[in-house]
């Protein structure tokens, strides 16, 4: 998993944090 992902739309995919992911 990821550490905490910051940002209003941040999410974790696999083991990488992304700034934005669609709902």
Curated annotation (Swiss-Prot):
Source organism (scientific name): Californiconus californicus
Domain notes: The presence of a 'disulfide through disulfide knot' structurally defines this protein as a knottin.
Transmembrane segments: none
A GO CC term assigned to this protein in UniProt: extracellular region
Keyword Ribosomal protein found: no
Tissue specificity annotation: Expressed by the venom duct.
Protein name (record): Conotoxin Cl6c
GO molecular function: toxin activity
UniProt keywords, alphabetically: Disulfide bond, Knottin, Neurotoxin, Secreted, Toxin
Location within or outside the cell: Secreted
Protein origin, superkingdom: Eukaryota
Cysteines joined through disulfide linkages: 2-12, 5-17, 11-21
């Amino acid at each position: 998993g990821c550490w905490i992902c910051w940002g209003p739309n941040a999410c974790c995919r696999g083991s990488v944090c992304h700034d934005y992911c669609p709902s």
